[in-house]
């Protein structure tokens, strides 16, 4: 935000300045679109121009949100070994890299900070400390968490000191010091409080001075009276927004929506629909006086002036008002600037009109609370000054000069192993210096350093694993003569499926690429009502593809049945909501609905199978094919042009070149898209393919395979140096990441010579998906402890159709790494389904041009997913959506808690519970010079990398050396000397473990049947 004294467009009218201000302030609002097309993004996109930790501090102040895990969580990680001493030392080394250490007396700055990170050093009020001393003997015993070294030093040195001072020993005996520990504690406490110390001073300005800076009148009244004025206006305001923005829930549309939010609101009030409550008395008269033609901007400006907010403070005040309901305000802002998110005929969206309505209602609520709770009946412009006079000063909790700071010194001395003999001689200046160092490392600074240590531990584990894997013979990691090649999305959930598929045979090869496979399209499936863009959200598809039946006769019968069934279901649903038919239908349908309800609740998997069988009977599946409405040429239609042969060849070539698959083709090459299907899950789109705009990637895979099989395309590819053998056939497919179902498309088009291999491929994929389901089940708390792969597969299938299941799958939870390079870097390495695997061959890209394209797509996409999970994990109430349990779908836009709340943006608790919030470690197989040159050319990448939103490491393809980007330069990484564990298969490493599992070498042996796998199940 700008400084409070700043203005926008100083020479313009106030209304125009307010418009310009809203353009700026709108960036602080959530950018999440409608929940049906959920696309992951950096929650703090407005702060991305700042270094990571600075951005977190700024956002924490603005949103009142947590930037890191809590200190208690970090200390639990220290206790479990997730953060060790080496990690803390590494974090401190980074902190003091450019600042020399300082020592005063027996302690240095780095020693004090090390102790503050390892152990909690508490503060206490005077009353609290007195109670602890009297009731718990806090100063008569040493800390229970004191390590043995400092503990024994304190006892030994204190006894020596007392031996030379009999009078001191006698005094301690009178105080209760009858054993070495109590004598050491009492003597140390006397020494710590022996020199008077000045108390710390609070620095935060009074709340009344912050109105218009980072607080509003609502905050002021809430703090003074305990009553929140927003509770009076939120219910009618949320109902108004829900009705105005509704995209299909309401049976009757709100009137006058086409005129804009403010005029529609005014019309409702003047027609007698004024918000309920005596506090809104006079609202209809005010709106009538405003007139129908008064611009909303003028209404908002008048409201701000009525509130007494000076223009130089508009920005801070308006920001605070918009952040009262950030979800709704953010949705309005997104619709205003991204109208393509909305269906045709949707009403106009304007953040300015939102503000005008909000301020209009807010003034009535503020007057009411001020009158009832403060007895103030004057103009709102004088409310702040009245509050200044009326409110008692809020004093900080009393702190004792004789207790609080000496008590912290008492704790610090214990942890450092400093006895009375070393503390007593310290001057007041030395004591204050030590305490100021301790106080300077406040809670936020400690959490920042502990977070760095937390990330360091993970970073070393991953880079050590990759370095150890590279030391294996290349023949163990490379596939010389592939039988099957399967290209999957770079999605971290695909890492496990790829690993299990490769463990089945050394001739199984997998690759990774963005799941739209380089073919952005507008797609309409056979049963779809409209088109959907299957491509990244920043790409506008120029081509339209539709799914059509191969036989029109059967398709027409199916279509007619589907329409009749839809009309019947709609009539029943609508009828239950009407007075006349509802009386008859509701009891009857209610009785019969108990049968499917019991089935879906108690036997979800069996019920789902029965329902699918019924649907197949009612609506038989028909064979289909992909078709462009303009295949005869490039004439533009409603959906864009057809793909020409040269465009097809260019798309296929680009995708194959990015993956490094330009030679050594297998007889069968599969492009496997992915998506997720589950029930009772408003966030289902968040589980789908982000590269396809939050939708399924199967159509893209199917289209790419058809292009790659085209003879004319292959002829043009040969001219480009990509010679696909005649014996190679491409297949498209779809992987349901919830159920592990894998469907291959158009296998009937394969030559007869490939039918046997296709059957073998299906068997291998079937075995891999069972093993992958088994690995996934170890992270589900509700999954039985001992499952065979077949049972595990049945379990994940049941989760997808269970109405009560809040976690059908875990999505991208646990994502932490992106590896861009050849599969040889990670083949045979257990990476715990935490890695985005992007195929790239540096030997085929001497200029780095291909890598630049890969980084521009994978970098921001991976960072967006990673950072959304990060922020939803560290503060699920502010940055996330909270628990799913009270969620209700609102206007087909998002979810609310219960019937009336803000739109909950971010990810729900059930998607992030097991996530480790670490920034993405991006490992790129390239030289540091190439990476630096790309960053210099690409501002978007430079912002992410130089500001630390992602962590970059380069693996030199010539030397195998790893270098990490830190503090603006690359520094060599030296892996630990300890060997990496080695096992025969993934199951042997993860069996019996439900948490995160570090990397290990998988020396795959010939495939064994699933029955034998079951014998080793955890």
Swiss-Prot record:
Cofactor names from the entry are: Zn(2+)
Mostly located where? membrane
GO annotation, cellular component aspect: plasma membrane
Ordered alphabetically, the record's keywords are:
Cell inner membrane, Cell membrane, Membrane, Metal-binding, Transport, Zinc
Q: Write down the InterPro entries for this protein, in alphabetical order.
A: DabA
Q: Where in the cell is it found?
A: Cell inner membrane
Q: Any idea what job this protein has?
A: Part of an energy-coupled inorganic carbon pump.
Q: What is this protein called?
A: Probable inorganic carbon transporter subunit DabA 2
> What is the originating organism of this protein?
Sorangium cellulosum (strain So ce56)
The gene behind this protein is dabA2
